[in-house]
Design a protein with these regions (language model features):
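Membrane-interface helix termini and inter-helical loops of multi-pass transporters
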Residues: 34-47
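Membrane-interface helix caps and helix-loop-helix hairpins in membrane proteins
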Residues: 100-111, 160-163
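Terminal transmembrane helical module of multi-pass membrane proteins
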Residues: 130-163
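Membrane-interface helix-boundary motifs at transmembrane edges
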Residues: 4-9, 74-84, 132-139
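Membrane-helix boundary connector in multi-pass membrane proteins
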Residues: 104-109, 125-139
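N-terminal signal-anchor transmembrane alpha helix
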Residues: 3-31
């Protein structure tokens, strides 16, 4: 008979949660990579557009923080309505995160992607709100993500405007 300790359950929750965030990021990255050398390279971009090599390390850190934050909420609040609500919002924003790459890079639709990223920002803000009720450090872990997505929203708007 195998006994799973409390520490092992916690570690498993963290690994699964971070892996889920990276899975969404990996799928989004697959869509993105194909568009970078062709369609995206031809777009007019604003002066504040970062170089392409910046995006992968930033997103790697953000997906790690997102997954870790979600695991903290899962472990502390999965049996409480606030915890469940927080995780529903988190799941929705994770789907919109992946959807943005599909719409922007896969479908080449900056305007449609702008709509998606605005909804994404709202869902991140709501996730932070609910995470804070369950685990304040988990909410703080999402602030860099909200900041980056806010910047990406401005970048998306500028690309739409310039093209």
């Amino acid at each position: 008979m195998m006994i799973i300790t409390h520490k092992k359950k916690n570690a498993l929750a963290v690994v699964v949660s971070i892996s889920l965030a990276f899975a969404i990021g990996g799928l989004a990255g697959q869509v993105t990579q194909g568009a970078i050398p062709g369609w995206y390279a031809q777009l007019n971009k604003p002066f504040f557009n970062p170089p392409n090599y910046i995006f992968a390390p930033v997103w790697t850190l953000l997906y790690f923080l997102m997954g870790w934050a979600a695991a903290r909420v899962w472990l502390k609040g999965r049996h409480h309505k606030w915890g469940k609500t927080a995780l529903y919002h988190y799941g929705a924003q994770l789907l919109f995160n992946g959807l943005w790459s599909l719409v922007f890079f896969g479908l080449h639709q900056p305007l449609g992607a702008l709509v998606v990223i605005i909804i994404l920002g709202i869902l991140i803000e709501r996730s932070i709100y609910w995470f804070r009720l369950v685990d304040r450090p988990a909410a703080y872990m999402l602030y860099p993500y909200l900041g980056w997505v806010s910047f990406a929203t401005l970048l998306n708007l500028a690309i739409f405007w310039l093209n």
